[in-house]
């Protein structure tokens, strides 16, 4: 009964004269119905499990040169489902044509049963990163880079099989980043610095699987971020001042919006910060 875009009741919802949802009338209608509850409360369940391994290496090769690197491995598995929480006075709920794949079209559902959707998402992540830093008395500079292999897979436990499958293939992405910076200390108390970077980021999981099933959007673009920062610092024994400005351009962002019972997958958005 709620439009998730506006936070307001959908058209046709039972309302009081004060403009709020009339749950009392809904419960009376549910109790009198011979076809089960028409209005119910449900709980959306999002159960996330993350496992990770992080290993790093650091070596100061000379008085001025330091190298840092490492490996970042992660595995994510997320369960996403909706369960009936309250039948609001009715004896049962009949999903009809919206029954999940493991339910029949004439299923009689009670509190605690699954409705609407039941899916599992997997993300496998393995990345390498490195940073080199060179420091002198008056100045310092660094250069860092990273490369990551990411793979997404969708399990549609509640939906009907597509081409005989309920589990998608893995879809692979290879985002990377590079960033550099320079700092110059022109007196004991004053310094200026500049940083710049370019990053690519794999599209979000729901941009790759926008239809809540195993059919993937093969054209989901990488998000691309370019950023610059310029700053000035002043420090004494008991006072610190930092002034900085930045410019960030973010291209090919993706977002998804629900319109009624349908979803819109919007790609190619650009932003400047």
Residue ranges and their predicted role:
Residues 41-49, 116-124, 153, 168-175, ...:
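Short sequence motifs at beta-strands and strand-loop junctions characteristic
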Residues 59-63, 134-138, 184-188, 224, ...:
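Outer-membrane beta-barrel strand-turn architecture
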Residues 4, 13-33, 81-114, 162-164, ...:
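Surface-exposed loop/turn segments flanking beta-strands in extracellular/periplasmic regions
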Residues 50-51, 81, 117, 125, ...:
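Tryptophan-centric aromatic hotspots in well-structured domains and transmembrane helices
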Residues 49-55, 124-130, 147, 176-180, ...:
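Hydrophobic, lipid-facing positions within transmembrane beta-strands of outer-membrane proteins
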Residues 151-160, 170, 183-229, 240, ...:
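Surface-exposed extracellular loop regions of Gram-negative outer-membrane beta-barrel proteins
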Residues 40, 66-187, 204, 209:
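Signature of Gram-negative outer-membrane beta-barrel scaffolds
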Residues 1-77, 82, 238-244:
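Outer-membrane beta-barrel domain signature, strongest for Gram-negative TonB-dependent receptors
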